[in-house]
């Protein structure tokens, strides 16, 4: 479901950028490029940045998306993976598997609620402002959508794995370029995609 959510996040960002950008025709090209895709494979570069470490850990891998509910990213010959399968988010680090539960799963659920609301024409849907703060910025040909889940419980907020998600789209080339998962402090994991 993580990859499905990434795909939905991507489509949402396109729709939001379409509404806010003067280059609506270019945004429509991005949406058209990915519309109706049943399978998608891309090269992905994962950059793990930790403020206390001098150098970032950079790893090349693959991103695979299969409709309707399966997607995964794999690195280090399968020792590191991020898997979304029918609403279950699994992370594998150095061969150790952990399934997102509790606060971490709730963060992904908030992200999914935001995305569903953006894509839904249902007027009874939950107000996005109740579950997340969103900000859209544009610099040159890049459009970035930042989604920050609203977690009112102070204890739960301290246990959050990610503080926000940033999706980047290249409007000129009509491509989904990256996803950044911001962590506490100045730490983050960046996924940069290419064909």
What do these predicted ranges mean?
Residues 62-113, 189:
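An acidic-aromatic
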Residues 126-195:
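Gly/Pro-enriched, hydrophobic low-complexity segments
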